[in-house]
């Protein structure tokens, strides 16, 4: 019985790793869309978004089976519960990347033309996804804490982008709509960083049994 449980946990980890890889890829495509949006890119984003949604359903199904059939002990129960919370954040990461790609075509010009820091922000968010999933699979508390700290980097990028956008509007008020679209894109990337932080916090819960919302 325990061997079967361990095999199911391995399958759970494989699915989470795949979801994490898909999240990385969809963020990279969202970043690429800022400078080179095209129909093929948008199609690929939709495909990956659907794959993330399917991964969500698969992981949820594995977790429910483990909970209902295996009666996991406390530590295993935390790992399974954390996985169910994490996939919600990963699914939202996919949604927000799709929202970015949907927004870019309506802009009059390249989204990073006047403020390329957005691409650096996207890269930082992409790294957070990789580290957050690795932290879960390895049950690495130090890596989870590093992800939480990296959110400060994404937040700092957002603040700098926001100030730059205010400068764009002050310099030329007619560019207000462009600037607001730019701000929305930056906000989506900032939220992606927040979701990665949430994942890291659930890793902390799975390892220690404590979570900031439960204290």
Regions found by a protein language model. Give the residues of each.
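Cytosolic, long alpha-helical scaffolding segments
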Residues: 1-215
